Structure formats: C-alpha cells, structure tokens
Amino acid sequence: AVGVKTKRRIAARLVKGAYWDSEIKHTQEQGLSDYPLFTRKAATDVSYLACARDMLRAKNIYPAFATHNALTVATILEWAGDSRDFEFQRLHGMGEGLYETLVREQGYHTRIYAPVGGHRDLLAYLVRRLLENGANSSFVHQLADEKLTDADILADPVRKIAAVGGTRHPGITLPADLFAPERRNSEGIDLNDRPELERVAEAVARPLDLRPKDGPAADPLVTRALKGFDTWSKRSVEARAACLDRLADLLERDRD
C-alpha cells in the first residue's frame, strides 16, 4: 500500500524462524491466550511460500528471500519463471553450496549477511542462529542427518500439514496449560495486540468506583483484618494457598 501511494518500489525481506524459540518462550512467560506464530515448522514453510508468491506478484515490491532451504528456493524459481527481478539472501557461512549454484551457474542476484561487531554484541546473535539452524527440523540440520533420504528432506510442507489436519504441535501446549496438571498458568495481556490494548485502555478509563478513599475510611477495614489474623494464621498452608489461588482467579475474571 505504501509503495502504491508513494509510487515507489520498496524492498521487502522475507525471513522465517529467526526468533521462533524466543517468541514461544515469551508467550509462555506472559501467559497469553495463544502463540503469535505456528507451532509446526511445516506450517511456517507453507506460510513463507504463500508470502513469497504474493511478493512476486506485487509490482511495488522488490522481493528479497532469505532462506537456506533448497525446496523453498526451487519453488520460488518455479513461480518466478523468467523473471529475475528479485534476490536471495543467506547468512555468512551457511548455504554456500546452494548459493554457489544460484550465482555461478544460474546468475541470480544474491546477498550475504555477515555479523559485524564485538563479542558482547555478537554473542546473542550467534546463539539465536545456533538455535535456529541446530534444531532437528531445520533444513540445514536435516542435510547432515544420514538417516534421512532426499525424499524426507524435500517433502512437500503442504502435504505434511494436511497429514496432521492442520493441528498444532502436540508437544507445545497452550500457555495456560504450561504447568498442568499441577496448576493453571497466570493469564497475561498482550499489549502489542490492538484489541487487547483497547480493552485495557477502556477499563482504565472507567474504574468501578470513582469515590476517593481517605484514611478514616480504611480504619475499620484494618481493624477487621487484625481481628481475623489469629483465625487466619491457624489455617493450614494448603487452605491459605487455596484462598490466594481463588483470589487470583477472581482478579483475572474481574480484571476489566
């Protein structure tokens, strides 16, 4: 839309998987309702290809496809036909054989991304790359697995997803069930989600009680709390914990 409005062609880089682990972990820690990404790699691959197809069709976008996946590259080349008005991108030290073929033998535009900086700046980046490409499901890792055949490595991701009915990965539970069956995870709010943010803003704008409370109004409440402390302290840890759990549930329920 921006390209059409400004009558300019905008370079757009398509990537996948770089922050998958951290996004999963963040969503679990925050106790959000669901994950903002796919839990199966095949679904991510299908989504990447769908985006790539739309980018190839867009006249106001210069597509840059960042991938080390040979099947993804082959699919994009098939869709592109004779067009070469796009480029492929790889990380320094990875996908060299695949990109050597693209550049030397076929003459496609490619770009190599290399990290630059001190040890402190680069360590987090390198760890993310190790996690991404060291995963069992990554294309680079599968290439080194002698137990996998070419057919296994180049299996159609669409068929993979169809075979499981599009269901989520069974080993990645919803954030709410992270600690099941012992307890339910606390519920968080995704402030990056506009409907959620608007709901919070609306709740803040209309508090349940607009009447301010002064010190004298709190005195009877403190007195009641002190009277009940002796009885409360004699209750078992389990009973008190159950009360706190119930209070937390009520706070979540009536948060708005």
Predicted regions and their residues:
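Positively charged, amphipathic and often flexible ligand-engagement surfaces
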Residues: 1-185
